[in-house]
């Protein structure tokens, strides 16, 4: 039972008091073997001993028990979905206050803390007066998960998102420290897994492992394009755009994960505006608006005939196959990306621009 940590607390408090198991046993009138079993979790003290132990160690009974409530994966998923929706229907401060209560209650449930951090950074922009403070809190949550979780994969994820929080907080040097070593070559675990499955004759499992490996690598490649476009210079801009569009078409990215394609179309449009090629920019914004209104609602990640195991893979995530924000907020952000982007201000009087903005409002 993960919620009860009395074994650990008795051992800890006894050592802090600098007494032996024998001395504690004599004080309570029990055997040394009983104390040993309590401290190793083989048995629990009788309920009548709890107030005596708490008084002896000068702690509350709750602290002695070490009660650390946990939440199951499906409960975390359901809670996250509800809170996402609440941000669109309830006052922002009310939802944030509920989040704080949940964090306090489940401060040792690290999978939940991780998702609460994700929830916060995906909604902190809804109140600009609190954005900085909330992003700082999210960063501290990811740091706590990184330092305390026994789940190695979760701790690694927490460190990555902690680095992302550093960027949100304009702390690039700290982000680099957290990301140190991330560029070192790493052997793909999925490829090794696929090889093992193949040797066992489990070909479907081998195929699934390879698909997941390829998909993860593909997403990493695509996520690099926006910054490449901004850093590549005028002479490389159209070459980078051309290469991205070939990758996007080859793997049907807009069907697979439209959310990674949308921001790149916006960056391409921005680049063409800055190059003075307004019609080219509008072509990509038109593509963006059509993609935003494509029939992929309800929002979730989907597979394709080539990537036919991806949907099932997403279902293994803690949040399952859902996006991190509510559909209402996502639709609003799609429109805001055009109207609130200063680069596109010069297009506001353009008839084509007005038409595609209206399309997003439909």
Predicted regions, residues:
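A short, Lys/Arg-rich alpha-helix, primarily the initiator
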Residues: 1-16
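Short alpha-helical DNA-recognition segment
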Residues: 18-37
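DNA major-groove recognition helix of helix-turn-helix/homeodomain DNA-binding modules
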Residues: 48-63
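Solenoid-like repeat scaffolds
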Residues: 69-70, 100-108, 143-151, 177-187, ...
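Generic helix N-cap/helix-start motif at coil->alpha-helix transitions
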Residues: 73-80, 106-113, 149-159, 182-192, ...
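Alpha-helical segment of the N-proximal tetratricopeptide repeat
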Residues: 74-108, 115, 122-129
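Short coil/turn connectors between adjacent alpha-helices in alpha-solenoid helical repeat scaffolds
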Residues: 83-90, 121-136, 166-174, 228-239, ...
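Alpha-helical protein-protein interaction modules
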Residues: 221-350, 354-355, 359-362
